[in-house]
Amino acid sequence: MNEEIKNEIQKLKKEKDAVILAHYYVDGEVQEIADYVGDSYYLAEIATKVPESTIVFCGVSFMGESAKILNPKKRVVMADGHADCPMAHMVDVDKIREVRNEYPDVSVVCYVNSTAEIKAESDVCVTSSNALKIVKNLPNKDIFFIPDENLGRFVASQLPEKHFIFNDGFCHVHTSIHKEELQKAK
């Protein structure tokens, strides 16, 4: 990115009282101009602490939604309105309600990589780093873990005393990594 563009971005940030948050996954040039770079949890946390009235989010839609949920009075703008995480849409409200009807005492545990609509229907939202600790401390035996089945199965493997119900959500990038490829790479 040339200096002229960088200077223009800095000028606009001051004029618009804006801060730029960028996920690790975005291009290096975008990370260079960002005020903060990190994972979705870190950026959500930073979003609650920045004084600027406008947050420009360089990441996928659920990240921007999370920033808005945590900062309802701030303006949150997505750098790319089409950036999305397919896994975030792999469960719907009807499925949550169906599971609640079948298991009246279920706790709906939602991985943060989900839409605002799904978060609103859930009992608790977790990250990959705190999912095990939070689920372990839930009083409910029945756990509906959404949308990421792989993270849910890892948590379930550590908590045999709980009964897990899974959604078939997944990250298409992560599920394309197979044991055989890892063994071959060794």
Q: Model regions: which residues?
A:
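Active-site loop-to-helix "anion-binding N-cap" substructures in soluble metabolic enzymes
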Residues: 1-186
